[in-house]
Structures are given as structure tokens and as C-alpha cells.
Swiss-Prot record:
<dbReference type="GO" id="GO:0000287">
    <property type="term" value="F:magnesium ion binding"/>
</dbReference>
<feature type="domain" description="Topo IA-type catalytic">
    <location>
        <begin position="153"/>
        <end position="593"/>
    </location>
</feature>
<keyword id="KW-0799">Topoisomerase</keyword>
<dbReference type="InterPro" id="IPR013826">
    <property type="entry name" value="Topo_IA_cen_sub3"/>
</dbReference>
<dbReference type="GO" id="GO:0006310">
    <property type="term" value="P:DNA recombination"/>
</dbReference>
<dbReference type="GO" id="GO:0003917">
    <property type="term" value="F:DNA topoisomerase type I (single strand cut, ATP-independent) activity"/>
</dbReference>
<keyword id="KW-0238">DNA-binding</keyword>
<dbReference type="Pfam" id="PF01131">
    <property type="entry name" value="Topoisom_bac"/>
</dbReference>
<dbReference type="InterPro" id="IPR023406">
    <property type="entry name" value="Topo_IA_AS"/>
</dbReference>
<feature type="binding site">
    <location>
        <position position="105"/>
    </location>
    <ligand>
        <name>Mg(2+)</name>
    </ligand>
</feature>
<dbReference type="InterPro" id="IPR013825">
    <property type="entry name" value="Topo_IA_cen_sub2"/>
</dbReference>
<feature type="region of interest" description="Disordered">
    <location>
        <begin position="685"/>
        <end position="714"/>
    </location>
</feature>
<feature type="site" description="Interaction with DNA">
    <location>
        <position position="61"/>
    </location>
</feature>
<feature type="compositionally biased region" description="Basic and acidic residues">
    <location>
        <begin position="685"/>
        <end position="699"/>
    </location>
</feature>
<dbReference type="InterPro" id="IPR000380">
    <property type="entry name" value="Topo_IA"/>
</dbReference>
<feature type="binding site">
    <location>
        <position position="9"/>
    </location>
    <ligand>
        <name>Mg(2+)</name>
    </ligand>
</feature>
<feature type="site" description="Interaction with DNA">
    <location>
        <position position="168"/>
    </location>
</feature>
Amino acid sequence: MSKTVVLAEKPSVGRDLARVLKCHKKGNGYLEGDQYIVTWALGHLVTLADPEGYGKEFQSWRLEDLPIIPEPLKLVVIKKTGKQFNAVKSQLTRKDVNQIVIATDAGREGELVARWIIEKANVRKPIKRLWISSVTDKAIKEGFQKLRSGKEYENLYHSAVARAEADWIVGINATRALTTKFNAQLSCGRVQTPTLAMIAKREADIQAFTPVPYYGIRAAVDGMTLTWQDKKSKQTRTFNQDVTSRLLKNLQGKQAVVAELKKTAKKSFAPALYDLTELQRDAHKRFGFSAKETLSVLQKLYEQHKLVTYPRTDSRFLSSDIVPTLKDRLEGMEVKPYAQYVSQIKKRGIKSHKGYVNDAKVSDHHAIIPTEEPLVLSSLSDKERKLYDLIAKRFLAVLMPAFEYEETKVIAEIGGETFTAKGKTVQSQGWKAVYDMAEEDDEQEDDRDQTLPALQKGDTLAVRTLTETSGQTKPPARFNEGTLLSAMENPSAFMQGEEKGLVKTLGETGGLGTVATRADIIEKLFNSFLIEKKGQDIFITSKGKQLLQLVPEDLKSPALTAEWEQKLSAIAAGKLKSAVFIKDMKAYAHQTVKEIKNSSQTFRHDNITGTACPECGKMMLKVNGKRGTMLVCQDRECGSRKTIARKTNARCPNCHKRMELRGQGEGQTFACVCGHREKLSVFEKRKNKDKARATKRDVSSYMKKQNKDEPINNALAEQLKKLGLDK
């Protein structure tokens, strides 16, 4: 009997498909049933070959070899997942298999994952496509009843290949040209370089900003504070201090008369469910998690604990087929501290509405929500628990009723001038009951509501004090990882002067990068020492500034990505041949390399040290990495690097913040931002005192984490080994 191979993108999805398709026989990287064989990728198993794959002459980076444009580009199996590729290939090539169902993610990249595997395996069998937005049993069953011909998605595949090949052709050649021309480790690309340019633009705006003082007036009356409002502009501040000085003088001794009372019943609905970017923003804001860290923790909640749905989603809505599963999901999380809210929702009944259910706004995957898996909070690490809490509370909030309140606005007059105050009376906490109010209170001080006394129109109030308030306009805030993610998702503010069509295209296609790649892009900018962190703020380095002066202008603008997306969409729609687009990209690569070769600019290492590289003898560069300070060889091919100061997991005995380990050998010293300094030898003695309280498991776990965080030159881990606490 002939069988059908179903190719999923990940093992977890493969297991879901296998369960529905009754494939229970376990094999090496697959599950088999009477009719179907379900196997899976691990994301991409196949990729485009590096330049070295086209000949030994490309192992060395030389300007005269550029541009490198192989015909055609070759596919290679990714080494670290080669075992799974072979497992998939063995199923695809079975003689009893006469059909393939592509069940990877419903999108451009999902199509590429599957088709490249099939192409590299050299399989020529009929293809069907499973195109579903969620992996519930119902969705899978309906999807298999409506399988579509693979030919319908060939244009989508062509657009995916075009995107990948264009990124290779432009990225490889521009990076090698910059690195060899300027003898510095420089990299660029159509996503990372515009992202770097946005950081530089923000820094330039901050440096060019001139603060302007402003002034206002507050009047303290019985039971409340009134704020002066300009009658014409309706603003509560003026940039002319003469205005407030004159008013303070003229209004002395005057009473306030209530001219108007406006009472309005209002409702506030819960914020939308999380997509990956919004969750990364919130996790950074609440807990200081990096974008990469959030994705890593989220992946564990999804794959290991099975407590949340697919992480790499760009949708903040659910599809209608998920609604019948909501009760089971609620029951799975019916433990403290969520049980009381689950009980309220079940008692009230689950009411779906367009605030969180919208099929039109779900593409590949729906929003991140809890699964029906029973929640055991004690099995989660601190970070996992924090992230789950964000997801769980947002999920509960959208199922709760609206927050209802009555807003009262008081308009009073003092000596003919208008003063206002706002108050709020809560009628029903609704969804806000789920949250600690301190979490949600992001309002500016000027806008905060007061508890107002009982008032009537015409009431006269004694003015106790009149006070001038003042402040200064503030420059734009520097990016942190959360706000940078937002800018990447919506870069329109950095596209002034570009065609409206390009701005619109980027808005429709999700901005720079994807939800799955943005964290890696930011991490790459850190690891390339193009940006650095000071506290939570991101600064562009001297190297980053110089790179932007050296790269062609096109590569610095988000417009390049927008132009590509327009053409890739046309390829997917069958309106443009991919060969035409690739021909343009090859011409663009030639132009870019030529521009870099002919550049008269130079790159200056302003961070060069007097320390010679132990490998090649060239002077090393001092760079601030994401986790500490390093010495890096200026020769890219040497690649030697050494950590000289780094953030550790050792806590300051005074303020309990993480300390930095500085220096080399016996002179190594821990330093904390609070000013505490502690020699490594003193640290060892303190650890010895705690030895009786530290279990082998504690120390082993600690050292594993240290090695995972930063395996290079980890002096702290070495010293812990010497203490023998892990024996």
C-alpha cells in the first residue's frame, strides 16, 4: 500500500499532526501510520553554501575576487542538523511513498524550509500543501480535507528563493568588500544596516536637541489641585515665563468658581494579546530581558513545558477555530494566582469578540496564549514564570469584561482664567482586576486623575496657593531593546522623503526583519561591536558610526527592504519572474562592490591598544561587548579574542547586583556599580564560608549557566573549580 509523507517544520507540530493522522509507530525522526508517515525539519535543514563551497580560492577574503556571484547558487545541508536531514530524506525516498504533503508554516519562509529539503534530497514526487493557521485537531482535520496542489504555491517558493539568494549576493559581497577594503571586521546587510542607521539617527537627534523651558500654574483649592489652561491653545504650559509671572500677580486673592462639570461614562478594554514583538517589549520593560533572552525562555515554555502556543508569531488575534478550546486552556491554568479569575470567566461565560478573535488578522500563527497543559508553577524557573505570567494575565484580561469608570472634568475660573481638573470614579474593575495597578499605571504625572470632592456648578472655592510649575522639553529617548524592536517593526518615522508606497509596503510586510529574526539582528549588532549598552540604553560605537560612513547610501535606508518586498510580492503573485529580480540584485552587487572599491575613505581603529595579539602579533582592539570588555585582534582572519572585564553571576554583598570581573591572573577584582570592590581572593574566602550551604547541584548549575552565558576566558568558573565545590 502506497503512503504519503507529511513534512512538518518542527517536532512539536509533527507530533500534533501524527496524533490526528493516527501515526503511532516511532521511527528514527518520524512517526508512521497505515496511510501517513509524519517527519519534521528543525527549522532550516538546508541553506545556501558559503563562498568557500565554490572553491578554495574563496577561503581567503580578497578584494580582487569580488563580486562573488556563482551560477547557480548551491544548496548544502546544515551540519548540526544533518542527522535529521538524512532521517527526512530516507522517508521521502522510500519506494512505498508516492506523495508528499508540505505541512511547514503557512508562509514564505515555511515554503522555503520544505522545498529546499525536497530539492536537496532530489525527490520528484507529487506535492500537496497543508495550509492552516493553527494546529488544533479540528484545524488539522479540516486542512487535510482541503489539501491544495503544491503547484499553487510554486510562485511563493520562487519569491522565498529570490529573497534568500538576494540576501546572499548583496550581503556576502558588501561585507567582504568592506572588510578587505578597510582592513576591519565590518559587516552589513539590508536589515542590520538600516537598523544601525536608525540608532545613529536617534543619537544625532539627541545631540542636536536644545531643551526649551516651559511654565505652568497650579492652584490648590479645597480637596483638589487645578491646572491652568490657555483659553486659545488649550495647552497647560507656556514657553513665555512672562505670561505665568503676570498671571500669578493678577490672580492673587481671587477665588475659584466652578464653571462647568462634565461627567462621562467610559469603558476601557484590555490590550490585545501578545505577538512575539510585543511580548519582547513588555519583558524588557518589566524585567530587563533582552529580545534574544525572551525568545529563548519562550521557546522553553513552548517546547519543553508545552504551556504556551507557537512563539514566533506576528499576530495579536485568535482565529475563530480556537474559541472552542478556550475553556480547556482556562482549566489548564486554574491554579493560584489565576484560579479566581478563571472561575469568574467560566461563571460569566466566554464571550468572543473582534477585540481578540479575527480570522482576517491571523496569517501563519495566532497570538501567543496558554495551552490546555496543566500548569505546575513550581516546575518553572524564575524567568519562565515571569514570562508565563505576562502571557497568562494578558489572556485572562481579554476574556474579562471592560474596565468601567465615570470621568469627571472640572472647569473652573479664577480671575477670568481657565483652570481644570480630572477625576475618575471606578464603576467596575473588569480586566484591570487581573493586574496590579502599579503595573498598568504608565500615565504622566500631569495627566493623573484625582479623587474629586462633591461639587456643583457655581460653587465658589477658596484658593489656598498659586504655584508656578516649570520644566524643560526632553530630547528623544535613546533606544533600548524594547523600543528598538518597535522601530524595526514600524520604521516609517525614519523614512522621511521616501515614496508613500514604500512606507506603506513596509507597514504591510512587518517592517525590518521578521518577528523570528529581529532578536538575532540586534544580537549581531552587539556581537559585531557596532552598538553597545550603557545601562538599558543602546549607543552606537565609533565602529558603527564609521561603518555608516563607508557603506553605500542605499543599504542604510529601510526603503531598500520595501523595494525588495514589493518585488517579492509581485513574484509570489506571478506578476514578476524571479530571474528578473535576481538579475537586478547581481547588478546591484556589482555596483555596491565598485563603490566600495573606489572609496577614498579610511577606517580608523580609535580603540587600538598597546597589547599585541598572542596569535599573530598585531595590536589588539579594546571593545565593549554585551557582557563585558574584550580584547579582539584587528585581523579578521586571526580572530583571537580575550575577555578582560565581564559581567558575572556573582552578586555584590552590599546591593546584590551582578558584579563585573576585571583584570588578569591574581590581580583580578570584582567591581560593582555601587562602588564595592572585592579581590578574587577575598571572593574565594567568602565562597568557602558559604561552602557548607551550597550543594553540589547548586554549584554545578551555576557553572553550567556561566559557561553557557560566556564560555570565553571565564576566570570565575575556573576559580570555582579550584574551590572543589562541584566535586
